[in-house]
């Protein structure tokens, strides 16, 4: 810390201003304000961050000493002002808490009550954010013995004012001889760290990470230092080098990482104007600019900054693991080593952890680097890797070069890992953590820490990729059949499971390069397969999976699965059941690994329907596609059998069906047709709208909640319905809109609750929805008002210009209107109102919400039930939708198109 820094704090000028004023508050506030400005300017100018946070602590020292001196403490009184915690370390960020301990020799607070209260009041009045405790030395011992946080804070302390002997006495009564011996302290800190990591989903890669608390954050570095200080009296990272706990290279890496995170935290405090350790979307772009990042052709500044952040915290997490393992060996197991169990001439197991039998193993036999992870997978009872071996792995990464990558022993070992029954994900993740995976597969190294600046992908590309592997493994485990019934069944019958893991590893490998990542990734996948000597059929399958990994999800979510042509086209692309099985399993894993909230019951049912229909088409033969008439006959025959079995007169059913039209039977299953038919026949002719809600009691995880509405057609039907559903807090995931020849509407909506769950068998909720929709259709004017809801904070930071594309359907007499826009509350209700304004009827709709964006497709006709033919009308419609969905502060809309 500086001894004198007149620019930051001019003591003589400050004293002069104190003397001039009746109240000291203004002088203190002025000094604090000026110091903040000076330090912020130094930060912007690129001043060394370590010096900055030490300078801030030094400045606060001066203010506190001055404030302390204004009160009447008897000279030599048994009271001291002590800095603890981060401030005790001499580190202060702009709005960090200033943690103080007012330390007494005896429990005689009454003697000092008045000056203590006056001192603390002054600190609050001048605007210092202070956390304070008033304790005697004995009380410190009692509190520290009971509370891990207290003992940790007291370990990092400095005397600001008063006798130093009190702090020394406090340190004596809280030493390892008195409480928290090193083993107990280590275990408590390790459990504390694990609980903290769990709070942040055990990943360094959260979209809005906490710079301090997330895995790989500043708290992990502090945890290392706390344990070292408690056990060995080590005061800082350099001392850990001197004592042999870390190497010079690791010290340099940790120091650079710590200083980077300090810069991030300092900048966050500046931008937020308060204590803020969360790297929120609100600040990421501004912080990237503040730290000097600029856009390039390949990446935005924010993406470059966040990739740097993720790589830094990953390196901290890696070293935290290494040092933590070393501490465990030294603190927990010293003198308790069990027998050594040899695995082969290169590796052995000691105390449940893998280690090399000789420090020169990797140098002599480089293939042992990959063998490490294969052995861990083959012996799942091994708990991990000993710290010395982790360090040796890190130190010998340089051996992984092109020669290493082409060596048959290494390529064989890497493929062997994918054939293991256990531990594939765990050990690929270890390889990534230790920096091995990105060295062996340079194309993987490029995606490490690469963010995707949206809410759809909540992980970096490498984390998502490894999550895909995790979900692929999860599908093989007992207990997942309820949530993934089809995928868990299919994964068991894949002829070569290792191929789907390789496809999962490569499916997003080309993200961030520009161009179609599926096509570019397929090229990389083919090179991988050839280098690893995979057979030709295996290679073709892996390459096909990478190139087509998005096709099944986009088909299921954006196309009409009731259209036989859609199924036939998809079946043609898939070709056979083996490819279909592999693609379905990969798609399920990919969706779950992208964002756990994406896997809802509706997406599950769409994929299952596409799989089932495609499998049926493949069994029938691609040269014999199912025609419309045949599909309609099959559906009617099955539905009629069901109805007759339950007592419905077949003549009544066929009389109703004659009014419904072919599309109705193409878009609904036989079960749904029977359900609708029975209810319509029983419904009184003048009974008003019929609203049916299908309970989803049997499959908690499958199928969205289906709402069927049968009522006399009216022009505002769609607009009223979607507005009412919005007011009922329902998310619409699919809409099938039909009108019978008798001018009755038969509309089916697939909905989920706002949190993505099906409505299930909640009778009260079902009745609330049913009665709400009936009321809306009876009194439409009361429901067309759109509720104005606040746009969620996260969505505001992912605004992009809406895109509206209008073109006529080549297969059917209708116009296809596609909208890609930022998600916002009530969006579908707003679109429905515009359709009403333009006198449009909605024939069908596919609704998809992907993170912060919606990708909706509407099939519409004009008032005469014809496709739109007036280009000027289409242009006005397009402009109206864009204007309605345009958010304030957006750029100009992206180019949209009209093809009539």
Curated annotation (Swiss-Prot):
Q: What is this protein called?
A: Bifunctional uridylyltransferase/uridylyl-removing enzyme
**Domain (ACT): residue spans on this chain:** 706-789, 816-896
Gene symbol here is: glnD
Region annotation (Uridylyltransferase) maps to: 1-342
Q: Does the keyword Transferase apply?
A: yes
What EC number(s) is this enzyme filed under? 2.7.7.59, 3.1.4.-
Name any one Pfam family assigned in the record.
HD
Q: What is known of its domains?
A: Has four distinct domains: an N-terminal nucleotidyltransferase (NT) domain responsible for UTase activity, a central HD domain that encodes UR activity, and two C-terminal ACT domains that seem to have a role in glutamine sensing.
Q: What is known about regulation of its activity?
A: Uridylyltransferase (UTase) activity is inhibited by glutamine, while glutamine activates uridylyl-removing (UR) activity.
Q: Can you give the residue ranges of the HD domain?
A: 461-583
Q: Which UniProt keywords apply?
A: Hydrolase, Magnesium, Multifunctional enzyme, Nitrogen fixation, Nucleotidyltransferase, Repeat, Transferase
Cofactor(s) listed: Mg(2+)
Q: What organism does the UniProt record list as the source? A: Stutzerimonas stutzeri (strain A1501)
What SMART domains does this protein map onto? Answer: HDc (SM00471)
Q: Name one GO biological process term.
A: nitrogen fixation
Span list, region Uridylyl-removing: 343-705
- Family according to the record: Belongs to the GlnD family.
Q: What does this protein do?
A: Modifies, by uridylylation and deuridylylation, the PII regulatory proteins (GlnB and homologs), in response to the nitrogen status of the cell that GlnD senses through the glutamine level. Under low glutamine levels, catalyzes the conversion of the PII proteins and UTP to PII-UMP and PPi, while under higher glutamine levels, GlnD hydrolyzes PII-UMP to PII and UMP (deuridylylation). Thus, controls uridylylation state and activity of the PII proteins, and plays an important role in the regulation of nitrogen fixation and metabolism.
InterPro entries per UniProt = ACT-like_dom_sf, ACT_dom, HD/PDEase_dom, HD_domain, NT_sf, PII_UdlTrfase/GS_AdlTrfase, Polymerase_NTP_transf_dom, UTase/UR
Reactions listed under catalytic activity: [protein-PII]-L-tyrosine + UTP = [protein-PII]-uridylyl-L-tyrosine + diphosphate; [protein-PII]-uridylyl-L-tyrosine + H2O = [protein-PII]-L-tyrosine + UMP + H(+)
Q: Which GO terms describe its molecular function?
A: [protein-PII] uridylyltransferase activity; phosphoric diester hydrolase activity
Keyword Kinase listed? The answer is no
Determine the domain of life of the protein's source.
Bacteria
